[in-house]
Structure formats: structure tokens, C-alpha cells
Amino acid sequence: MLAAKRYAEALIKLGQEEGKLEIFYEQLFKMFEIIKNNNEFNTIWFDLEMKRSEKKQRIKVFFGGDIDSYILNLLYLLIDKRREIILTYIPFYYKEIYDKIVGNVDVQVIVAHEIGSDVLNKISKWLLKKYGVKNPRFIVKVDKSIIGGIKLLFNNIEVDASIKGALDSMRKELVKIAIL
């Protein structure tokens, strides 16, 4: 959704100017959770027959000052433009841009057995040195089929230091030699 991406980009710019990048991030995802789980909000938000002024007033009462004025103004703008549906997309575009700015990277760590925080700290230092990853968010998965070692997946990069990966590489080389 191009419109949702534009709203997210505008919020990022505003968040940078106002020093509220993280506040906007938290509140947008809070908003997403409300949309998923709160029937009262959904009844108000997705009622296209309700007058815009009434909807704005009810949204303001619903949040009762627990929301940043810029986010509230975004909600008002979406109501005015009759673009309520795109509120569900804005947080994800915002997160994508926000993560790039602050250096957050989701790193899938595949290991043959559980690892401790000391190993994750070493991986974190290595990622910073080798790839400039400042804030890795580790998603650890245990996969006994890799036999040993470790496999990292992030930003379309695969670092395979597993025993299975090494054996697969050797097998490919042997097949090449056998074909020649």
C-alpha cells in the first residue's frame, strides 16, 4: 500500500524532527494491537457511516490523552481522507524504515543445540565488526540436522558455519570433480 508507506515516511520524518521516533514506533504498534483485539475501537474506527466529526470525538475519548498528539492527528487525517483501513499497514512500513535508521536487524540464528547469552554476545560483536549490524535481534532456532556449528540469516545474507553446510560444500566439490 503506497499510501500507508507515505504516511509512515512522513511520521518518520516528523519523529526525527521532534525526537519521537521510538514513541511513534511504540504507539503505532499499540494501535495495531488495539485494532486486532478491541471490538469497541473497531466499531468506531471502521464505521464508514459515522460522521467524521463524531468519529474524531469518539476516538479522542477512547484514548483519553494516552496517545501522542501527532499520532492522534494522524488518526484524524485518516478519518478525514476516509483511509481508515490503511492504519493496519502503517506500523509495518514505519518499522521497516525505523529499523534501518536505528540499525535494528532481525538475525535468525540456527544451531544444533541451545546456546547461551555469552555466545550471542560474541555473535553480536562479530556482526558489528563484519557487517556493521548495530542492534541485532536474535531469533534462535534449534535444528539438529545442522549437526554442529552455526548458521546466520539476516538482510538476505546467509552465513553458514555449520557442519552440514561444510559437508554439503564438500559433496558439491566432489560431484564437480567426478563430472570432470
Curated annotation (Swiss-Prot):
It is found in: Cell membrane. InterPro entries: ATP_synth_OSCP/delta_N_sf (IPR026015), ATPase_OSCP/dsu (IPR000711). Signal peptide: none annotated. The keyword Transport applies. It comes from the Bacteria. It is a peripheral membrane protein. It holds the Pfam family OSCP. GO terms for cellular component: plasma membrane; proton-transporting ATP synthase complex. F-type ATPases have 2 components, F(1) - the catalytic core - and F(0) - the membrane proton channel. F(1) has five subunits: alpha(3), beta(3), gamma(1), delta(1), epsilon(1). F(0) has three main subunits: a(1), b(2) and c(10-14). The alpha and beta chains form an alternating ring which encloses part of the gamma chain. F(1) is attached to F(0) by a central stalk formed by the gamma and epsilon chains, while a peripheral stalk is formed by the delta and b chains. F(1)F(0) ATP synthase produces ATP from ADP in the presence of a proton or sodium gradient. F-type ATPases consist of two structural domains, F(1) containing the extramembraneous catalytic core and F(0) containing the membrane proton channel, linked together by a central stalk and a peripheral stalk. During catalysis, ATP synthesis in the catalytic domain of F(1) is coupled via a rotary mechanism of the central stalk subunits to proton translocation. This protein is part of the stalk that links CF(0) to CF(1). It either transmits conformational changes from CF(0) to CF(1) or is implicated in proton conduction. Belongs to the ATPase delta chain family. This is ATP synthase subunit delta. It comes from Caldicellulosiruptor bescii (strain ATCC BAA-1888 / DSM 6725 / KCTC 15123 / Z-1320) (Anaerocellum thermophilum).
